[in-house]
UniProtKB/Swiss-Prot annotation:
Subunit structure: F-type ATPases have 2 components, F(1) - the catalytic core - and F(0) - the membrane proton channel. F(1) has five subunits: alpha(3), beta(3), gamma(1), delta(1), epsilon(1). F(0) has three main subunits: a(1), b(2) and c(10-14). The alpha and beta chains form an alternating ring which encloses part of the gamma chain. F(1) is attached to F(0) by a central stalk formed by the gamma and epsilon chains, while a peripheral stalk is formed by the delta and b chains.
Physiological role: F(1)F(0) ATP synthase produces ATP from ADP in the presence of a proton or sodium gradient. F-type ATPases consist of two structural domains, F(1) containing the extramembraneous catalytic core and F(0) containing the membrane proton channel, linked together by a central stalk and a peripheral stalk. During catalysis, ATP synthesis in the catalytic domain of F(1) is coupled via a rotary mechanism of the central stalk subunits to proton translocation. Component of the F(0) channel, it forms part of the peripheral stalk, linking F(1) to F(0).
Chain segments annotated as transmembrane: 1-21
Membrane topology: Single-pass membrane protein
Family annotation (CDD domains): ATP-synt_Fo_b (cd06503)
InterPro entries assigned: ATP_synth_b/b'su_bac/chlpt, ATP_synthase_B_chain
Protein's organism: Brucella anthropi (strain ATCC 49188 / DSM 6882 / CCUG 24695 / JCM 21032 / LMG 3331 / NBRC 15819 / NCTC 12168 / Alc 37) (Ochrobactrum anthropi)
Name of the protein: ATP synthase subunit b 2
Length: 159
């Protein structure tokens, strides 16, 4: 009997003790439990992955909606700015037209006033010149007669 025989006997006894203590069943149950745990973890990971994909799709959808809404807001703001610009341009043009018309009216009034002033000055000068000429040429007797005639005309016009 050599050492190999005793090693074989020891191995058989060891395996018998393991079989008696039901170690292979415990190892099998442990492996089955671990396999079930891994299976559950894989199922949970698949569920979490699906949820993550749904959340990602929802995020992308919301992002696209937000981009569309932002585009709509920008387009609306551009339309409003264009309308405000057109209103401001129209109001400015109307203001300039009113100011031009007012300036033209003032110029026309000033022209009329200037013409009237020139006419009045011309009349005053003519009256003064005529008065001087008449005063130089008319004697006292003729002046008295002219005064009486003018007085009678004024009286007849007043009555």
């Amino acid at each position: 009997m050599d050492a190999t025989f005793w090693a074989l006997i020891g191995l058989i006894i060891f395996l018998a003790i393991l079989a008696y203590l039901k170690v292979p069943g415990m190892v099998g149950r442990s492996l089955d439990e671990r396999a079930d745990r891994i299976k559950n973890e894989l199922e949970e990971a698949r569920t979490l992955r699906e949820e993550a994909q749904q959340l990602l799709a929802e995020y992308h959808r919301k992002r696209k909606e937000a981009e569309k809404e932002a585009g709509d807001i920008v387009a609306s703001a551009e339309r409003e700015a264009k309308a405000l610009l057109e209103d401001a341009k129209r109001a400015t043009e109307e203001y300039v037209a009113r100011r031009n018309k007012l300036a033209e009216q003032k110029i026309a009034t000033a022209e009329v006033d200037a013409i009237n002033a020139v006419r009045a000055s011309a009349v005053d000068l003519a009256v003064a010149a005529a008065g001087k000429i008449v005063a130089d040429k008319v004697d006292t007797k003729v002046a008295g007669n002219l005064f009486k005639d003018a007085l009678s005309q004024v009286k007849s016009n007043l009555n």
